[in-house]
């Protein structure tokens, strides 16, 4: 890849990663859906989105970051994960010099089952989880993006929980509370050799399908089909989701593209495929 030109990440037709229109329109609520496999960890993409939102541009990813926005114009990010502890995100964001007062990290991994699920009905569990997000969002509702990693694990953790309940009582209400909701999901289930027809598997697949349908952009992180390479980690496929973009700018659209990316120790580089 040494002779191949490095590219900037561009997701929308205004040459942005997160359009300013998303935060200027009062009724704008947009869903991003990021899928990855266990071998294509999405932390670098999460970092780029937080950096863009707080600092105005993903300068750690893009070499030409000429259109930086003042951080005061869109300032707050809420991150939550069901598979990683708080330090996983704070350590990474500190390296990018993201001010700690511009984001909150909700830890749903440590003692989550004991504190939030044990001996509680499903409705109470979902309302309590939603309340934690509401508390983190309430001071900056017009400037907040929410990134939630693997909410589909609730389908495994909460006995009897269905995809419809998860969407209607958690995902959809959460989307209404923030300007941009970013769901990050592991798609390994679709790579299982023998099809699993269990109710749990069906719920998971329905969740992925519904998330795609409700999203206006889908970002797929995939490993190389040919296996390992020293100069390429995987591919990023950017495509439109099933929902229209919620904005008054009718000309704004997703720029569908495919990149190769290389994860290095302190950075990630993008190249056109």
Curated annotation (Swiss-Prot):
Subcellular location: Cytoplasm; Nucleus
Pathway(s) of this molecule: tRNA modification; 5-methoxycarbonylmethyl-2-thiouridine-tRNA biosynthesis
An example Gene Ontology biological process: regulation of translation
Lineage top rank: taxon: Eukaryota
Keywords: Cytoplasm, Nucleus, tRNA processing
One GO location term (cellular component): nucleoplasm
MF terms in GO: identical protein binding
InterPro entries the record matches: ELP6, P-loop_NTPase
Assigned protein family: Belongs to the ELP6 family.
Summary of the function given for this chain in its UniProt record: Component of the elongator complex which is required for multiple tRNA modifications, including mcm5U (5-methoxycarbonylmethyl uridine), mcm5s2U (5-methoxycarbonylmethyl-2-thiouridine), and ncm5U (5-carbamoylmethyl uridine). The elongator complex catalyzes formation of carboxymethyluridine in the wobble base at position 34 in tRNAs. It functions as a gamma-toxin target (TOT); disruption of the complex confers resistance to Kluyveromyces lactis toxin zymocin (pGKL1 killer toxin). May also be involved in sensitivity to Pichia inositovora toxin.
Subunit structure: Component of the elongator complex which consists of ELP1/IKI3, ELP2, ELP3, ELP4, ELP5/IKI1 and ELP6. The elongator complex is composed of two copies of the Elp123 subcomplex (composed of ELP1/IKI3, ELP2 and ELP3) and two copies of the Elp456 subcomplex (composed of ELP4, ELP5/IKI1 and ELP6). The Elp123 subcomplex forms a two-lobed scaffold, which binds the Elp456 subcomplex asymmetrically. In each lobe, ELP2 is tightly sandwiched between ELP1/IKI3 and ELP3. The Elp123 subcomplex binds tRNA through ELP1/IKI3 and ELP3 and can bind 2 tRNAs simultaneously.
Protein name: Elongator complex protein 6
Organism (species): Saccharomyces cerevisiae (strain ATCC 204508 / S288c)
